[in-house]
């Protein structure tokens, strides 16, 4: 569907990646993929977002940040962070929420723990927080 801003909804506050993260936060303009499935099963659904039919979506909550059960591996998956039209116009990757959840997910996948603090510029339910100095 069409790229747009949308709110992510927390689904599992107990997972180490989620500790200290808000219940809801607004993601920058990005694609919201739906009906995505792979060979692994979702183990821990961390965040979902409503996929609005008005933007070409499914009309339901879709899992966007989750862990995958695949053997003994720790796998973190995010559907966020699609490229913009130019290096300068890349709001999805500039979003502090995308950057922080990706870093926390990578740390958890590597170590099973998350030591990173949630920064003050993490987005809120009403406000996107972009780090404009990010370059892809």
Which stretches of residues belong to each language-model region?
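Catalytic beta-strand/loop cores that center a nucleophilic Ser/Cys/Thr
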Residues: 1-74
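Extracellular ligand-binding/catalytic regions of CAZymes and related secreted enzymes
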Residues: 53-64, 69-136
């Amino acid at each position: 569907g069409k790229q747009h801003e949308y709110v992510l909804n927390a689904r599992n506050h107990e997972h180490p990646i989620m500790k200290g993260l808000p219940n809801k936060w607004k993601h920058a303009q990005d694609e919201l993929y739906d009906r995505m499935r792979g060979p692994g099963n979702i183990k821990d659904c961390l965040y979902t977002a409503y996929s609005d039919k008005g933007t070409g979506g499914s009309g339901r909550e879709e899992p966007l940040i989750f862990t995958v059960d695949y053997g003994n591996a720790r796998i973190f998956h995010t559907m966020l962070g699609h490229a913009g039209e130019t290096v300068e116009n890349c709001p999805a990757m500039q979003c502090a929420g995308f950057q922080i959840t990706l870093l926390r997910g990578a740390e958890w996948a590597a170590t099973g723990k998350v030591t990173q603090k949630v920064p003050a510029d993490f987005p809120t339910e009403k406000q996107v927080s972009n780090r404009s100095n990010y370059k892809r």
